[in-house]
UniProtKB/Swiss-Prot annotation:
SUPFAM superfamilies: F1F0 ATP synthase subunit B, membrane domain. This is ATP synthase subunit b. It comes from Psychrobacter sp. (strain PRwf-1). F-type ATPases have 2 components, F(1) - the catalytic core - and F(0) - the membrane proton channel. F(1) has five subunits: alpha(3), beta(3), gamma(1), delta(1), epsilon(1). F(0) has three main subunits: a(1), b(2) and c(10-14). The alpha and beta chains form an alternating ring which encloses part of the gamma chain. F(1) is attached to F(0) by a central stalk formed by the gamma and epsilon chains, while a peripheral stalk is formed by the delta and b chains. It is a single-pass membrane protein. Gene3D superfamilies: F1F0 ATP synthase subunit B, membrane domain.
């Protein structure tokens, strides 16, 4: 065998092998590589998108949290105002009630004073009538009259 002929035969076999590979194997291999590259690119894009979505979600959560805190603060402030208003209303109502009770007590005291005065007037008039009866029954002299008035004054 001749080396040249062997080299030419091997070169032809290699060329056929290369043509066969380029015709049948290379497109499948390039398709797999291209598909893998696309999957990797899609994965990287998805990771970037997920990272952006995460940042957006974190910002949204922070905004929601700030909004919730503001609402909670507003509710607390409103509850405090309502409680203070109820306290003020209760104080005002207690003052009105206290004033009403004082007024009733004054009226009751005034009524009792008037009743006592009326009772005293009645008693004084009865004593005056009794004194006048005694004076008229007795003889009217200065000494007897003074004694009766002293007795009447002692009874008063």
């Amino acid at each position: 065998m001749n080396i040249n002929l062997t080299l030419i035969g091997q070169s032809i076999a290699f060329a056929i092998f290369v043509l066969f590979c380029m015709k049948f194997i290379w497109p499948a291999l390039m398709g797999a590589i291209s598909e893998r590259q696309q999957k990797i690119a899609d994965g990287l894009n998805a990771a970037e998108k997920a990272k952006a979505d995460l940042a957006s979600a974190e910002q949204s959560v922070e905004q929601e949290l700030a909004t919730a805190k503001a609402k909670a603060a507003a509710l607390i402030e409103q509850a405090n105002k309502s409680a203070n208003q109820l306290i003020e209303e209760a104080k005002a109502q207690a003052q009105v009630e206290g004033e009403r009770i004082r007024q009733q007590a004054r009226e009751s005291i005034d009524l009792e004073i008037n009743q006592a005065r009326e009772s005293l007037r009645t008693q004084v008039s009865e004593l005056a009538v009794l004194g006048a009866e005694q004076i008229l029954k007795e003889k009217v002299d200065q000494q007897t009259h003074a004694n009766m008035l002293n007795e009447l004054a002692a009874k008063l």
